[in-house]
């Protein structure tokens, strides 16, 4: 490995996985900013929370994720009593899937209680106005920011807890999906590669940073193409690029 290390990219091969990755990114930002240890972390927290609520309003994430978890459960059940398969580990995974699926299905629509929160609703209406978090635009926010830190942190963690069943279910589905494939060495001749596969959800790439390139990817569940671009010129890279790829 080179001194600069590797850069990792993921690309969804269907719309559901695209939404799941966006939600995962927002959940990660919420988790990193919820303790409000830095002066402007509240901006990261609220912008991530409101983007999350917009996604949950537009997409039936609970129903889609429930179906995908059930599909995973059937796939794993097919391995039961197969010689050479660690049955203890398999049963553990099946129990995890059943538990997060049950918790997800028993909750109301994710984000519904947050949408009904009067403080959050008033804040969301004006939060994305450029520079709109001034005290004259959002006096309620200005008041909230002057509350004791422990009070504000209780608020942020309580709001996050409303998304816990979604977070647990999504994290498990993405983890198991990522674990379906190992990275294998690849070479993109003249910076280009295309391939076919069967019913895949996700591409994962590791690229040496000192190659000075980033990938532009298009694809769906049965075919993909990627073109490496030069970061310096923002044009097609014409050299061979070595990288590793996992098709999940």
Swiss-Prot record:
GO BP field: division septum assembly; FtsZ-dependent cytokinesis
One GO CC annotation: cell division site
Residues annotated as signal peptide: none
Keyword Cell division: yes
Record-linked Pfam families: ZapD (PF07072)
Location in the cell: Cytoplasm
UniProt entry keywords in alphabetical sequence: Cell cycle, Cell division, Cytoplasm, Septation
UniProt xrefs under InterPro entries: ZapD (IPR009777), ZapD_C (IPR027462), ZapD_sf (IPR036268)
Family affiliation: Belongs to the ZapD family.
Complex formation: Interacts with FtsZ.
Function in brief: Cell division factor that enhances FtsZ-ring assembly. Directly interacts with FtsZ and promotes bundling of FtsZ protofilaments, with a reduction in FtsZ GTPase activity.
Name by which UniProt lists this protein: Cell division protein ZapD
Source organism of the structure: Aliivibrio salmonicida (strain LFI1238)
Gene (name only): zapD
